[in-house]
Amino acid sequence: MFRLEDFNFHNKTVFLRVDLNSPMKDGKIISDARFKAVLPTIRYLIESGAKVVIGTHQGKPYSEDYTTTEEHARVLSELLDQHVEYIEDIFGRYAREKIKELKSGEVAILENLRFSAEEVKNKPIEECEKTFLVKKLSKVIDYVVNDAFATAHRSQPSLVGFARIKPMIMGFLMEKEIEALMRAYYSKDSPKIYVLGGAKVEDSLKVVENVLRRERADLVLTGGLVANVFTLAKGFDLGRKNVEFMKKKGLLDYVKHAEEILDEFYPYIRTPVDFAVDYKGERVEIDLLSENRGLLHQYQIMDIGKRTAEKYREILMKARIIVANGPMGVFEREEFAIGTVEVFKAIADSPAFSVLGGGHSIASIQKYGITGITHISTGGGAMLSFFAGEELPVLRALQISYEKFKEVVK
């Protein structure tokens, strides 16, 4: 795949696809983490004398965060300490004229790419390159730099459509993400421990099945709703209250798949030995084999128990490779953050090479000041897709573009 260092960008127009999709409140961005992650790439392009045209999406149609990129231009201007022009258009004549007016070292950001209906659906490269977004923008750009790892699992025009039309190059963040994930996945070091929590049960089951079948993991530790599904699949009773909650969330549909995975890999999948429930606003620990397990019928599971967290810590401290995605419980409430904090601290304290991803995972380590994890991935869904053994469309597009243009570039 092409790297930034392979090209001379002086006076060239570069379409830089990033993922600046950020949480917002009252029209203001409340976390600039994704902005800071791509600053090295933007600064490199500016210093190389490129004319930088940034493209990002923000929110999903009809969601609260679905808005223009005017605020993104303001945040970028502050972080870069230079003006970033907001172009209130994507690929129309106005946008193309504004792009042509850019001078070496200047930066502009296009309107929210999802304002274009073409950008909302996933389609093969062959269809994406026929879109107006790709056809119109390709007339006014020289190169495409992709630094949007968080959306690498999507196949949309701005992400993959330019692959056979313009040289498509990895940004620094994309390169860093790929290197870290490849190292974690393919490393011969052992033990390799996967820690899967949170609510993305379907994706997590795919990861468990793939890494155990391909012998990419020695052990999988579970937390969050992922653990609840596996615990039910093992035949434990989580109580009426919790089963009803899982049914409402559609999670009981995954129990059969979890049972099939356990039939093949039971010794390699660890589930909690105890849980913490919300007992009238307080944390109460319940051992799965104790007499008070009847409380599970009335009170909701909010976290893994302390004994489970201690057992997980012992395992993690001996690991050489750790991959983690998703919290152990409802970390937003301090009394139920114990499992998440203890497990993530263990990952940070472990001598292992560690990779952690997922929006809630990152939010939890920031909230509780946990440092020491080797690589924090910006991609939750993309990271899970990678470890599930699925082909990431953006990586495929980068490879296709390299094969198409490698001789031309030389």
From Swiss-Prot:
Catalytic activity: (2R)-3-phosphoglycerate + ATP = (2R)-3-phospho-glyceroyl phosphate + ADP
Metabolic or biological pathway, per its Swiss-Prot or TrEMBL entry: Carbohydrate degradation; glycolysis; pyruvate from D-glyceraldehyde 3-phosphate: step 2/5
Localization, UniProt: Cytoplasm
Domain of life: Archaea
Record has Transferase as a keyword: yes
Gene3D superfamilies given in the database record: Phosphoglycerate kinase, N-terminal domain (3.40.50.1260)
Subunit structure: Homodimer.
Protein name (Swiss-Prot/TrEMBL): Phosphoglycerate kinase
Source species of the chain: Pyrococcus horikoshii (strain ATCC 700860 / DSM 12428 / JCM 9974 / NBRC 100139 / OT-3)
